[in-house]
Amino acid sequence: MNKKYLPSALILYLNYFIHGVGCSILGQAVIKEALAAAWGVEAMAITAISAALGLGRLIALPFAGPLSDKLGRRISTAIGSASYAIYLIGLALAFNAGTHGGYTIAYVCAIIGGIANSFLDTGIYPAVSEIIYKAPSVATMGIKFFIAIAQMLLPFVLGVAVTSTAAGFTSYNPLFYGCGIAYIVLFVLVFLFPLPDADQKASGKKEGLIDSLKHTHFSFESIAMILIGFTCTGTFQLLSLIHISEPTRPY
């Protein structure tokens, strides 16, 4: 790995560190109860907000990848960071709105959060693989590592981030605002450090999207891996939603 890309790799991984918090927030029982109380809905209704994340991801997937190839990893990552900031800060604003449209605001922001997820995936996965080109599998494992660390630390952070409003509601807005501001900082930083694909474009060595597609070959093993990834992720999300909606049900 070229050492000049080391700060860039750290910035990309930090996006997924905050993502580890963002994608897990709505699955935390205490946050779910706090949001439900503020919006005047049943706790189970928060499941629909979680599902909106998946909806947003599905909406963006068809064009996020081609845009990443055409516009570059930097732009794709920046779109993801900015969208995630909107999602997280939007959740805080939705909490403040309470029963005056708070639930609707949160649903729209969750869709934007899902779109952010798609752009981060299509920007950062190839970017870190291009940076750590001698060991791309290690590069992608690093993404999972940062997500796992964030999810492990989240329960401890919740104890620090909790506050109470004047109306007596439990609030986790400091966490929402903090993560949203972190994404704004990362949005700025991603433009300040070099990325391999941007350098290749500048030197005229970057292969075009059409040329890249011409050399694409899906082996039996690659198709099997795609199917495994889809079914494993889908099963995990399904079980998570069931657990969120029925936390006291024995398994």
Which residues are covered by each model-predicted region?
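Helix-loop-helix hairpin linking two adjacent transmembrane segments in secondary transporters
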Residues: A139-P194
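Single conserved hydrophobic/aromatic residue that forms the stacking wall/gate
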Residues: I242-Y251
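Cytoplasmic helix-loop-helix junction between adjacent transmembrane helices
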Residues: C109-F145
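C-terminal ends and interior cores of transmembrane alpha-helices
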Residues: A82-T99
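Juxtamembrane intracellular "pre-TM" segments in multi-pass secondary transporters
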Residues: M1-K3, D197-E221
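Central cavity-lining transmembrane alpha-helices of secondary-active solute carriers
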Residues: A51-G65
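Pair of pore-lining "gating" transmembrane helices in MFS-fold secondary transporters
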Residues: N2-Q28, H217-C232
